């Protein structure tokens, strides 16, 4: 069964470079050329001029998004529309996309029947992930670069689609924040933030990676695999990924640290 270069690139992106997994996605028809065309597009988002300032006059900063189970959606919303309360709208866009393309977003892809997934993702208590970033990248027509603090790796959703712009998100293992270029100082008004960048802008990418590296050095990330954690909000001890995720969903606490016995 043949498949296009665009399909192969998208499969590699979704599988984080794991060739065997990417091949399965292509051969089994989970990612197809049709699937790359089934997402509605957002109305044009005006790009605000910031008085001619370039990234050289700016500093990359972390813009904190509320830990309300919609951090992924609101982080994207801040970068694209300067809106931290856009979760319900973006959840509905994703739900409609999944519901209208059941041949593309199959149960094998979603882990749930498309109708069930559409209902599930509109529940404000549920978290978004890679599928949502993939769809939102196509909806806005831009690359969404999610930088994982622990690995210092940049996962690019929309790579190879010839989009002209990109945004940056910061991921600590359970929570997404937005990254923005502040006007000269981290304390500059957020209204002057630059949140969209040319897709090929290496300087903004390196600045975003530098923020992640600094946070990694300070161990400001959550290692969910096999370690003992402590909730830094209520001080509860937790064991591994399942307990941490369950605690986060039940309490909205999303600040964890590794537990070290004295």
Describe the residue ranges of each PLM region.
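Alpha-helical elements of the RecA-like P-loop NTPase motor core of helicases
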Residues: 20, 73, 177
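Deubiquitinase catalytic domains
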Residues: 129-243
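Short, well-structured alpha-helical patches and their helix-loop capping segments
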Residues: 6-7, 124-128, 171
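Short, amphipathic alpha-helical interaction segments embedded in low-complexity terminal/linker regions
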Residues: 1-70, 79-89, 96, 218-236, ...
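Papain-like cysteine protease catalytic cores
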Residues: 44, 49-161
